[in-house]
Amino acid sequence: MMAAAVEEEEMVERMHGWARDMDVASRRAEEEAMRRYDAASWLRSTVGVVCARDLPDEPSEEEFRLGLRNGIVLCNALNKIQPGAIPKVVQAQSDAAGPTDGSALCAYQYFENLRNFLVVVEDLRLPTFEVSDLEKGGKGVRVVDCVLALKSFSESNKTGRQASCKYGGLSKPLTARKYFILKNTDAFMNKIMKGHSAEAIQSEFSEGQSIVTDFSIESNEMTTSDSLSILLRKVLLDKKPEEVPLIVESILSKVIQEYEHRIAIQNKMDEEEQNLLNITEQVNHVVVNGDGEVKQFQLEAQTNFDVQQKQIQELKGALSFVKSGMEQLRLQYSEEFAKLGKHFYTLSNAASSYHKVLEENRKLYNQIQDLKGNIRVYCRVRPFLPGHRSLSSSVADTEERTITIITPTKYGKDGCKSFSFNRVFGPASTQEEVFSDMQPLIRSVLDGFNVCIFAYGQTGSGKTFTMSGPKVLTEESLGVNYRALNDLFNIKAQRKGTIDYEISVQMIEIYNEQVRDLLQDGGNRRLEIRNTPQKGLAVPDASIVPVTSTADVVELMNQGQKNRAVGSTAINDRSSRSHSCLSVHVQGKYLTSGAMLRGCMHLVDLAGSERVDKSEVVGDRLKEAQYINKSLSALGDVIASLAQKNSHVPYRNSKLTQLLQDSLGGQAKTLMFVHVSPELDAVGETISTLKFAERVASVELGAAKANKEGSEVRELKEQIATLKAALAKKEGEPENIQSTQSSPDMYRIKRGNAIPAFPKNRQPMEEVGNLEVRNNATPMQKKASFQFSGVLSENNSSDLAENCNGIQKTDRMAVGNNQFENGNSILELEPGATQLPTFFYQRYDPDKQRRRAEPVETDDSDSFDAATSSPSDQEMLLSTSGLKADGIASRGAFIIKKPQTKNTKITATKIPNLAMKSPMSEKRLQTPIRNSKQLPFSTTGGRRTRNGKINTPK
């Protein structure tokens, strides 16, 4: 009986040990979880939820390890406790990467953070851990201990006293250990006492619980089997004998169940052991068989190694051979490269020489153009507009001086037509390229030449863009106007020590055949174009503003552009509805010699020709288009007449041709920009424009001449003007004598006959630089037959004669053998001689002129006052063919006819001559006789009638 009880007691003790092991493991896992939760909670509260977003509030061991393995949370927590402990914390590369994918930081980055953290923790003498503890399979308990020690250290720093737990884990009070013991006891007792009466079990368990509750901390160190034995003895000691079998039976049933369970486990373990033995036998068999295979593999490997070793030796030999061959090739190529370098050097020198020769040829070509006086024509192709790019272009090819147009069959058989000009700019050309090619022409204005640049083409072809630029200006998009003026002011600054320049600007427009001033806001006052411009001013009534810098000119141009007539059509949303002209007047004075020079530059932006069916204009826009096309048609007629060298040039058909008369027919350097559009639907207008440009390029104007005059000539002209004013005042005439700065339509008398001075008969180049009174005379419009009907009288007042005594000898007029020789004036004033001539000219008879075979005639024959020209700055040309001889006064005074307009009576004005002390006063003019039809001047003062008879005045 007692032996059975002992066996049962031993069985119970074994069962209790097994249960105790399970409970201890469970308790330990729960304790570790609580410590881990505490550490995670403290880290989240210390560094913040955002920084510790990868660390849950109650993490598992794997989540805790992944949340701390990059070291960011640990380093930030340590910096919170010890500011600046870790100066640099390597942050994650991407916040978007999850913490569990293993790609947030590279191994080096989180190893750097962890190493810095462990160094600081070790310096603080706190528990540390290894970096491998944060890897999978590491000891996470040491990490938790380190975090909790850091927490205790932080709390001690805050409170100023040492914490209850010295840098360890959670502090466990005594009640906690009692709690776990009671819990384990309850589990065991519930297991072994099931099935007994509730009252007995409860009473006995209460006694056992009271005993266990009184245990001290030292009694908890006792083994569990001893305590259970004592407990069972106490329970069975007081029981009745009849109750013991029931209790023992219950315990035995439980033991039997446990035994059967263990037997099942043992059987399973035996099966696994048998399987393990089988596997071991198989492994041994494989090992035994594998020894032969290994030996065979080693033999094959050795053989392969020997073969590869041999191949390596062969490769080393081949490499040595290749190296020697490469060295030879290197030397050979070095020699070849040296030869190529010399050859390229020769080619580069040849190319440089070629470019120099090409530049010299261009300069020579420009000089030839200057000598011939051809109008230079530059062609520019507009690029496609944004959003309107066509699939194909009408421009087939562009070269330096040639443009080829794809034409329909009606324009050519081969489908292409080429045009040649002085320069051709493609669609990709810039404003800088366009201006650089014409820059020498611009600079000649400061040398005293007149220059005219005008843009021609259909509407929307880019004329305003070339001349002015786009609506929003940039440094790269500035047009010809701005760049030309900027260049003028730069040269002015460079020559300020030699020449003193004064620059002034005019800006006008021709709108519906009306000349308007663009520099006056709201100024619709109609201006007139003078056929004999004074001081280079074709429109003297327009505002002329002095300028000193490019900024002043830009401001004036902006004001003019605002006042210019601009409208929108179906072809162009910013179409110019008028012709604009920017005139830049330059007057310079040499600081050393005092000589004067004068130049003028006209920058003309023509309105584009347009077809009404395409532009879809109505009303005022239609009227504007009609005026524009009419003026451009008149320009075409003028160009055609000049190209064919016709005797009649219709300048007066339009205000535009009147304005350009001095540039097209005078002594000026002229450049025309012709613009074409690349669209296929505009090929008709393109070909028409290019044909017109070809006609313009064929016009020869003769060599241009600089407007220069010496200081002595200028002083003499001023004296003559003063004397003329005094004479006019004395005779009671209106003081309308003006400074002689331009040459009217006069005739130069040569030996034997009279030759009209036409614009194309310019002075030779050797006379260009002479400092004499040469001005841009307005071309003569019609050849007038003038009658020289008076000479200076000899009975003038003595006071005027005294005013003329200081005039030096400036001109000479030799009379005899039908010859006039002209220097700077008609008459030669010797010392002591006094002459005050005033010439008047009679308008010729058109009918009679057509009956006679005369030289070239022009269209502009407006009368002008002879007082506006002086004998000191003009070359007088007299045509004696068909002259009407006026009677000469008996006392030697000539009667000279003034020019008359239509339906105006011809009046004669007698001008007395001053007393002449020189032999000049004794001479009489002899009229040169060209042919038998000419009649000599009558010395009796009579005049010839229509039938050839001479009426003598009574």
Swiss-Prot record:
Its main location: cytoplasm. The microtubule-dependent ATPase activity is regulated by actin binding. Residues 704-733 form a coiled coil. Optimum pH is 6.5 for ATPase activity (in presence of microtubules). Residues 844-855 have a biased composition (Basic and acidic residues). Keywords: Actin-binding, ATP-binding, Coiled coil, Cytoplasm, Cytoskeleton, Microtubule, Motor protein, Nucleotide-binding. GO terms for cellular component: actin cytoskeleton; cytoplasm; microtubule; microtubule cytoskeleton. Residues 928-954 have a biased composition (Polar residues). GO terms for biological process: microtubule-based movement; microtubule-based process; minus-end directed microtubule sliding; nuclear migration; nucleus localization. Disruption phenotype: Shorter coleoptiles due to impaired cell expansion and increased division. It is found in: Cytoplasm, Cytoskeleton. It comes from the Eukaryota. Residues 374-699 form the Kinesin motor domain. ATP binds at residues 457-464. It holds the Pfam family CH. Residues 33-155 form the Calponin-homology (CH) domain. InterPro entries: CH_dom, CH_dom_sf, Kinesin-like_fam, Kinesin_motor_dom, Kinesin_motor_dom_sf, P-loop_NTPase. GO terms for molecular function: actin binding; ATP binding; ATP hydrolysis activity; microtubule binding; microtubule motor activity; minus-end-directed microtubule motor activity. Residues 844-876, 912-954 are annotated as: Disordered. Residues 864-873 have a biased composition (Low complexity). PROSITE patterns: CH, KINESIN_MOTOR_2. Expressed in primary leaf, primary root, developing flower and coleoptile. Forms oligomers in vitro. Interacts with actin microfilaments. Binds to actin in vitro through its calponin-homology (CH) domain. Belongs to the TRAFAC class myosin-kinesin ATPase superfamily. Kinesin family. KIN-14 subfamily. This is Kinesin-like protein KIN-14Q. The lineage of its organism: Eukaryota, Viridiplantae, Streptophyta, Embryophyta, Tracheophyta.
